A protein has these predicted regions:
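Radical SAM enzyme [4Fe-4S]-AdoMet core and its adjacent flexible, acidic
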Residues: 30, 48-50, 90-235, 239-250, ...
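N-terminal pre-core extensions flanking Radical SAM catalytic domains
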Residues: 1-26, 40, 189, 215, ...
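Conserved alpha-helical substructure of the radical SAM core
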Residues: 1-96, 108-113
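Short, flexible loop/turn elements at secondary-structure junctions
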Residues: 55, 80-82, 103, 138, ...
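Alpha-helix boundary/interfacial micro-motifs
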Residues: 27-28, 70-72, 78, 119, ...
Length: 265
């Protein structure tokens, strides 16, 4: 059983951030029947769904329906850039919401204070039934301003040099991360050796049903199968899947994309 499965309900996004990898796949929204098919095939394979890979999940017109349907059998988690968080502020069927504060930029014609205030208003509702995790990069150009706003809101001194994970109040947390580079075949090779939690711990399902090893295969480079055409068991027993598993168990990266990934140690 997987610890979690990433399900991309859409690869559309309301932003165009410099740090995000460019989406080269056809833009699509998963429909309700497709989503139900994914859920049915994931039963007995995981208890935790993460409704994101590429794109902004809250842009999906049926996001609340998806959350409510999935919550009957799974613990639902999602990551959002925060701009559309009002759309789920009344939803009580979410286990955890990760808010990527590094997504803020003045080019989106909204002030930082207004952006944060909108998030705070929604978090006041959501924190009663969900864990809230603010995520921010240590060296983002707005980090200092954002931390000042958070510090004032939660009446707490925030020092990222002392702790990378801070409890702001009950069910509300702040995590610091370093900016990462999306693995891409165009990137310089990082290393040919290494082990990874992909396939053992988790898999990803793209909006068109393509099954990939992890949430960082945003382009669907390593196609292991398609959830709409095959069962999970058949995909797991597939040659490419098994070759990757065997490689990782021997500290070897079999796929070219994995060799370009800095997350694999």
């Amino acid at each position: 059983m997987y610890k979690k499965v990433y399900v991309e309900t859409t690869n559309n996004c309301n932003l165009n951030c410099d740090f995000c990898i460019h989406n080269e796949r056809p833009k699509k929204f998963m429909n309700i029947d497709e989503f139900k098919t994914v859920l049915e095939k994931l039963k007995n394979h995981t208890k935790y769904l993460y409704l994101h890979v590429l794109g902004e999940p809250l842009i999906h017109p049926n996001i609340n329906k998806f959350i409510n349907i999935a919550s009957s059998s799974f613990n639902v988690n999602l990551t959002t850039n925060g701009y559309l968080i009002k759309r789920i502020k009344e939803n009580k069927n979410i286990r955890q919401i990760n808010i990527s504060l590094q997504s803020f930029d003045e080019k989106y014609q909204k002030s930082l204070q207004d952006y944060m205030n909108d998030i705070f208003l929604s978090v006041e509702n959501l924190k009663n039934t969900a864990y809230i995790s603010y995520r921010i990069w240590v060296k983002n150009k707005y980090t200092e301003e954002i931390l000042n706003i958070l510090s004032e809101k939660y009446n707490i001194m925030i020092d990222e040099t002392k702790s990378k994970n801070i409890t702001l109040e009950k069910n509300v947390f702040l995590s610091f991360n370093e900016e990462f580079t999306w693995p891409d075949l165009k990137n310089k090779e990082a290393c040919k050796t290494g082990k990874c939690y992909a396939l053992k711990d988790h898999i990803g399902i793209l909006v068109d049903g393509t099954v990939v090893p992890c949430c960082l295969d945003s382009k669907g480079t390593i196609k292991l199968g398609n959830i709409f055409k095959s069962n999970i068991e058949d995909i797991i027993n597939g040659k490419r899947y098994q070759n990757m598993l065997k490689g990782f168990s021997n500290n070897k990266k079999c796929e070219e994309l994995c060799k370009k990934c800095n997350f694999i140690k």
